[in-house]
């Protein structure tokens, strides 16, 4: 009998759970939306007894469940005590992005009745309710800057049947502090102490992926010393995180605008991780935004 694989999809309203569940359908999962958490163990039990007709389940559990959602944490604790093979996926986005999405779709937030119709207040109330649940997440995806296609590709990367379930998913990303911290980062490194190519006229409109910018960023003694210490730390952490059972590791490198220094350092770190035999992906979150350094 195949061990049932279950993905619990949760997170902020407006962060993309509906898009996610459609992506899971495309991957061959049996999908359920707006499932009361108390029903999950029974459904997993029935699926396990289906003679392998159902081997993968994805279920969305969120605050639409009302009072039933209050037992979600207890259900997760009970599942952890059992033999269930499950992962928790938490989708998140910055508050201003969620507000904008609600305005564009003209839909009501599930907690709008508790907040006198204020979308932002409803989002903040939901964030408080989900604070403890987020700690159970095996995977956290910040969808603030992701298109529907980007999100689908990210989910395929994590959950496709071809990916080894024993492999920790490592993502190296660059970002600009002026656009906000990435919500899904496990480790954040600030490289704004490195001399900034933005103030070199011939480099201002290039990115950290281009040779001239790379050479500028990497030539400084402070950069060389930082990379040595960073490489030692990351190569120490990866096997220890994997041993602990961590499923996802997101390493974020930030500079002011996310186009120059952070991009170069992220590229260097990505190559180091690959060259040491680990599977990794790289994502430059803000590289296409207006150049401000």
From Swiss-Prot:
One of its GO terms (molecular function) is GTP binding. GTP binds at residues 62-65. InterPro entries: P-loop_NTPase (IPR027417), RapZ-like (IPR005337), RapZ-like_N (IPR053930), RapZ_C (IPR053931). Pfam families: PapZ_C, RapZ-like_N. Keywords: ATP-binding, GTP-binding, Nucleotide-binding. Displays ATPase and GTPase activities. NCBIfam families: PRK05416.1. PANTHER family: RNASE ADAPTER PROTEIN RAPZ. Belongs to the RapZ-like family. This is Nucleotide-binding protein Csac_1160. It comes from Caldicellulosiruptor saccharolyticus (strain ATCC 43494 / DSM 8903 / Tp8T 6331).
């Amino acid at each position: 009998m195949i061990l049932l694989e279950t993905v619990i999809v949760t997170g902020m309203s407006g962060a993309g759970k509906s898009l996610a569940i459609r992506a899971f359908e495309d991957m061959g999962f049996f999908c359920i939306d707006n499932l009361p958490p108390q029903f999950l163990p029974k459904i997993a039990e029935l699926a396990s007894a289906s003679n392998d007709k159902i081997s993968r389940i994805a279920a969305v559990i969120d605050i639409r469940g009302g009072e039933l959602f209050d037992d979600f944490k207890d259900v997760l604790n009970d599942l952890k005590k059992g033999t269930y093979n499950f992962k928790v996926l938490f989708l998140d986005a910055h508050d201003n992005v969620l507000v904008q999405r609600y305005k564009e779709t003209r839909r009501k937030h599930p907690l709008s009745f508790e907040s006198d119709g204020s979308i932002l207040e409803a989002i903040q109330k939901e964030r408080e309710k989900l604070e403890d649940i987020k700690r159970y997440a095996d995977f956290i995806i910040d969808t603030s800057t992701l298109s529907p296609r980007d999100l689908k590709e990210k989910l395929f990367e994590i959950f496709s049947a071809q990916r080894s379930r024993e492999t920790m998913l490592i993502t190296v990303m660059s970002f600009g502090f002026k656009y906000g911290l990435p919500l899904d980062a496990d480790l954040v490194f600030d490289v704004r102490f490195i001399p900034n190519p933005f103030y070199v006229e011939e480099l201002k409109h290039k990115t950290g992926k281009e040779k001239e910018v790379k050479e500028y960023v990497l030539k400084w003694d402070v950069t060389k010393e930082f990379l040595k210490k960073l490489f030692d730390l990351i190569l120490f952490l990866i096997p220890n995180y994997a041993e602990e059972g961590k499923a996802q590791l997101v390493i974020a490198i930030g500079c002011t605008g996310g186009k120059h220094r952070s991009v170069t350092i992220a590229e260097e770190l990505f190559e180091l991780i690959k060259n040491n035999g680990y599977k990794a992906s790289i994502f430059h979150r803000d590289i296409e935004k207006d150049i401000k350094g």
